[in-house]
């Protein structure tokens, strides 16, 4: 055994312990036919990334589950990796090029630019991996993957070709979401909708025959140069007679048809809708049904193109102002109304997204969605919490075709070649040398790359060796056991992994989707750069220790719900680490044994703690299995702090100081046994401190992290003894509280009289009253015995009436006078605060933190007054 230092210093322990695990391949997983498989694939963080609090929580949850299953005897694989993060990485490298060298990617050309990106990835891409290690991540780092490594690239190409051959990938002109800032297409899931104030402009379109006009309402007058029709509901009596006629498009003076379509809602707006098929997905569908012309007027960079007439070259929002002014001057603008509506924005740069007609590559979703819906509906895949099942199903039932092409250079280049002669598209697993249709040798490769999420969708099986179906890893660990992820990427990623797994593997990618919420600041706000409220997890880990941070992120955390991060809680969890450390040091300083074995004869307090531990083992295991990690951690915390440290250690001190060796060693064995089993339960949550303490205790095996998880054992269930000890603890707690209220020092010994029907229980507890309740003597009498209460204070518990002759220790009159004075002072302070809280001016002007502080002070004063009243009442009995 080694001696633990007086103070626990995580900075001195964590790096050394982690390296010890790495040196001994503790995280390495191998397919083992004698063990059950357990696997998690890490949601790959962006290669550009630095660890933020969301990563820290996500990683901690996965690590807890992996360590738990590893200790339960599973061959547990936690497979790490990073994502190439198309747009994010390209933007980073372009910024570096521009600021350091004054160059653009076009100055370098595609090949040289990609060389720069790979160099950047090699330099910075490992940063987040090292940060995860500091948090204690027990991944099998030897299997670390990258979404653009050779294996993943092969899987991407195979999937693309398979889906294309089945007709599930196609190229077509459709309305897509376009980011004019990032200059690329976005999938529906990459668009965030924000409620923005705007206007509704009512515009008059004159009828071609001069018989009047039709009025439309629009939020986007800048697109009207691309209008190719006006639609009305065929059942709308107001407009029926106009269907088939034409009207004149203001400003452009172009004749456009009026068509009848049920898409238009009677009574909504004016009932007439301008049709811009090139810039609105609904208009595009109406246009297909009525053969309307498609005229695009907004260019890729968000400016008006040559089809916009005199507005050519203007920014789209400048054009809006100009065209509204022209419409007003020419008499076409009827009225303007304020109007708040949802505007699509880019998830990365937050600029407004532009719906554009564009030739892009798409995945046909309807056939793929069917199986992806079935495996969730029939329970093959379970969501935790279950409420997210509905969210997932609803999205999958209404899913649109997925736009997978991106106008970037960094990413998986689409494996399609256009024949320069006949225009045929050649999609091949290997680079073709000639056109499969006409034999022409001149082929031009598609420049677009695939959406980053395309490769991420294959992650559960591409990382296991697919498309090699004989891969030992794939056979053993697929389907994976759990996917741990945030609710914000159910559509981006979870849904796509499910339909990809069902299509490529004919098997679900995971059994359970464990959803967690976001980590918010202490005011409940999302952490962001713009608010400046982000908290660096590595700073917290450096200051308080990784274990304290991990425990903070888990305790009180429930599946699917956001959590607020309080720095003060990190401090509290560091105090918890210190409590465990000090308790362990106390145990070790009293150890003379070098092997732990429970004694055959157990005392009352031994049976109590073993029974409590046994219940804890069952409750922690059950909650871990149910993914209620926050509940499990809270139960461990309460057991260690209350049952073990505050009570059991104190209850054993008499025996530890006994002259009898057997008595001493029996106490040591139980203390040590309970500590070791508790360290095992705590280990997945706090891996560093538990391993360090365990290594210093008598133990079997090399590492705590590879030791056997405790199991519930009926032979350690002692309900009668547990109840008896709890009765004694309740009595001691009540006595201490009353003595504290009356300012009786612990050094003052008291002769207690206990009136109870549980004489045996209290007789067995006499040594504990002596040590923990400052008893000089304990007299036990029947529950109905007549007690002379003169000069005594009575304390009642569920099992006894306890009388304390405190008159000889306390000057009641003097103490009552002191209490009355303290109460009067507290009441005066309380009245002042309550008056302030009734003042409307104070409530309107004071910062929220000040108001909350005043309310908290008022509650503290109320509690103090209540306590003083109780003390006075006790003395007056």
Roles of regions detected by a PLM:
Residues 99-115, 382-383, 538, 559-571, ...:
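Short, polar/flexible loop-turn hinges at active-site or ligand-entry regions and domain interfaces
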Residues 37-43, 49, 274, 424, ...:
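Short hydrophobic beta-strand segments
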Residues 67-75, 96-106, 130, 134-139, ...:
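Secondary-structure transition/capping motifs at alpha-helix termini
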Residues 202, 394-454, 458, 503-546, ...:
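Feature 926 captures the class I aminoacyl-tRNA synthetase adenylation module centered on the KMSKS loop
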Residues 34-42, 64, 97-104, 129-136, ...:
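Active-site-adjacent bridging/hinge elements
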Residues 54-66, 73, 82-83, 152-155, ...:
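Structured ligand/cofactor/substrate-binding pocket environments in proteins
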């Amino acid at each position: 055994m080694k001696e633990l230092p007086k103070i626990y210093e995580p900075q001195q322990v964590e790096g050394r312990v982690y390296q010890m695990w790495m040196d001994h391949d503790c995280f390495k997983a191998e397919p083992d036919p004698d063990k059950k498989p357990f696997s998690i694939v890490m949601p790959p963080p962006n290669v550009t990334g630095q660890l933020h609090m969301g990563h820290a929580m996500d990683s901690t949850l996965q690590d807890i589950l992996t360590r738990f299953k590893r200790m339960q005897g599973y061959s547990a694989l936690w497979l790490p990796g990073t994502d190439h993060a198309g747009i994010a990485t390209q933007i980073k490298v372009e910024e570096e090029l521009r600021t350091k060298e004054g160059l653009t990617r076009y100055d370098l050309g595609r090949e040289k630019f990609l060389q720069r990106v790979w160099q950047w990835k090699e330099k910075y891409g490992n940063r987040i991996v090292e940060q995860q290690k500091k948090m204690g991540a027990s991944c099998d780092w030897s299997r670390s993957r990258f979404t653009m490594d050779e294996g993943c690239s092969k899987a991407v190409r195979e999937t693309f070709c398979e889906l294309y051959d089945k007709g599930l990938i196609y190229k077509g002109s459709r309305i897509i979401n376009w980011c004019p800032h990032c200059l690329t297409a976005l999938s529906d899931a990459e668009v965030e909708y924000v409620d923005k104030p705007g206007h509704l402009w009512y515009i008059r379109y004159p009828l071609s025959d001069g018989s009047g006009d039709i009025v439309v309402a629009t939020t986007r007058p800048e697109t009207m140069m691309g209008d190719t029709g006006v639609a009305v509901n065929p059942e709308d009596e107001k407009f029926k007679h106009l269907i088939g006629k034409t009207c004149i498009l203001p400003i452009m003076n172009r004749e456009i048809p009026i068509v009848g379509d049920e898409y238009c809602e009677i009574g909504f707006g004016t009932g007439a809708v301008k049709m811009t098929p090139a810039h609105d997905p609904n208009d595009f569908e109406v246009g297909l049904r009525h053969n309307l012309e498609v005229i695009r007027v907004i260019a890729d960079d968000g400016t008006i193109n040559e089809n916009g007439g005199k507005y050519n070259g203007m920014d789209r929002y400048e054009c809006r102002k100009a065209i509204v002014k022209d419409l007003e001057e020419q008499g076409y603008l009827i009225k303007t109304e304020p109007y708040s509506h949802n505007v699509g924005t880019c998830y990365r740069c937050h600029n407004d997204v532009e719906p554009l007609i564009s030739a892009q590559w798409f995945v046909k979703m309807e056939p793929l969605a069917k199986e992806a819906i079935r495996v969730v509906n029939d329970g093959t895949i379970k969501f935790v919490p279950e409420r997210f099942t509905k969210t997932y199903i609803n999205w999958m039932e209404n899913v649109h075709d997925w736009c997978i092409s991106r106008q970037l250079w960094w990413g998986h280049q689409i494996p399609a070649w256009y024949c320069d002669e006949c225009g045929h598209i050649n999609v091949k697993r290997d680079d073709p040398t000639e056109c499969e249709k006409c034999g022409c040798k001149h082929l031009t490769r598609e420049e677009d790359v695939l959406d980053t999420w395309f490769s991420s969708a294959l992650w559960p099986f591409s990382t296991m060796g697919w498309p090699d179906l004989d891969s030992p890893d794939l056979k053993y660990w697929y389907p994976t056991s759990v996917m741990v992820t945030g609710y914000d990427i159910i559509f981006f990623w979870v849904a796509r992994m499910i339909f990809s797994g069902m299509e490529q593997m004919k098997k679900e990618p995971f059994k359970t989707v464990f959803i967690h919420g976001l980590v918010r600041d202490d005011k409940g706000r999302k952490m962001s750069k713009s608010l400046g409220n982000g908290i660096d997890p590595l700073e917290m880990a450096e200051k308080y220790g990784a274990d304290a941070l991990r425990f903070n992120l888990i305790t009180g955390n429930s599946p699917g719900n956001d959590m607020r991060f309080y720095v003060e809680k990190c401090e509290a969890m560091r105090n918890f680490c210190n409590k465990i450390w000090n308790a362990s040091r106390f145990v070790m300083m009293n150890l003379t044994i070098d092997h732990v074995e429970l004694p055959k004869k157990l005392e009352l307090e031994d049976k109590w703690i073993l029974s409590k531990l046994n219940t804890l083992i069952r409750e922690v295991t059950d909650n871990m299995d149910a993914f209620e990690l926050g509940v499990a951690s809270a139960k461990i915390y309460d057991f260690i702090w209350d049952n073990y440290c505050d009570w059991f250690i104190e209850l054993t001190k008499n025996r530890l100081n006994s002259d009898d060796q057997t008595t001493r060693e029996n106490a040591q064995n139980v203390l040590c046994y309970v500590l070791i089993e508790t360290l095992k339960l705590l280990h997945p949550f706090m891996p560093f401190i538990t391993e360090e303490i365990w290594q210093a205790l008598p133990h079997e095996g090399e590492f705590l992290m590879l030791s056997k998880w405790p199991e519930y054992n009926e032979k350690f269930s002692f309900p009668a003894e547990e109840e008896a000890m709890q009765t004694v603890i309740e009595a001691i707690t009540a006595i201490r509280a009353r003595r504290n209220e009356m300012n009786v020092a612990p050094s003052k010994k008291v002769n207690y009289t206990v009136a109870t029907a549980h004489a045996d229980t209290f007789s067995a507890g006499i040594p504990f009253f002596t040590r923990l309740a400052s008893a000089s003597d304990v007299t036990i009498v029947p529950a109905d015995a007549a007690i002379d209460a003169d000069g005594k204070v009575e304390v009642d518990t569920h099992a006894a009436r306890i009388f304390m002759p405190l008159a000889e220790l306390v000057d009641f009159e003097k103490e009552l006078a002191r209490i009355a004075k303290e109460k009067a002072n507290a009441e005066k302070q309380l009245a002042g605060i309550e008056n302030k809280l009734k003042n409307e001016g104070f409530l309107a002007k004071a910062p929220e933190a000040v108001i909350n502080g005043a309310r908290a002070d008022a509650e503290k004063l109320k509690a103090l007054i209540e306590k003083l009243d109780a003390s006075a009442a006790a003395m007056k009995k």
